[in-house]
């Protein structure tokens, strides 16, 4: 039982270290110097609307969900062509059956 607890503890610590390491590249956004008055009035408005941001959300910079969804909708991969090819094959079978019904 102690061995299992030790393995679970090591796993949790490793995952915590991995998560912390994955957030570190974004932390430079928070530490970057900003010109005085550049974002005056924007930050309090966002904070009031969204509530207090968690540490990871602050490090990422407060992004609105519509912007993230728009970015995802622009991405297309090679699977689109594969799906079109698969649907074309299925349509071929259906069209053949429909043509057989029309001609006596």
Swiss-Prot record:
Post-translational modification Pyrrolidone carboxylic acid, affected residues: 59, 76
Species per Swiss-Prot/TrEMBL record: Bos taurus
Gene giving rise to this polypeptide: GAST
Domain of life: Eukaryota
GO CC terms, sorted: extracellular space
Sulfotyrosine found at: 87
Localization (cell): Secreted
Descriptive protein name: Gastrin
A Pfam family this chain is assigned to: Gastrin
Signal peptide positions on this chain: 1-21
Family classification: Belongs to the gastrin/cholecystokinin family.
Alphabetic keyword roster: Amidation, Cleavage on pair of basic residues, Hormone, Phosphoprotein, Pyrrolidone carboxylic acid, Secreted, Signal, Sulfation
Phenylalanine amide modified-residue sites: 92
GO MF annotation: an example: hormone activity
InterPro entries: GAST (IPR039236), Gastrin/CCK (IPR001651), Gastrin/cholecystokinin_CS (IPR013152)
Disulfide bonding pattern of the chain: none
Summary of the function given for this chain in its UniProt record: Gastrin stimulates the stomach mucosa to produce and secrete hydrochloric acid and the pancreas to secrete its digestive enzymes. It also stimulates smooth muscle contraction and increases blood circulation and water secretion in the stomach and intestine.
In-chain residues carrying the UniProt-annotated modification Phosphoserine: 96
Residues covered by region (Disordered): 27-77
Propeptide: 22-58, 96-104
Gene Ontology BP terms: G protein-coupled receptor signaling pathway; response to food
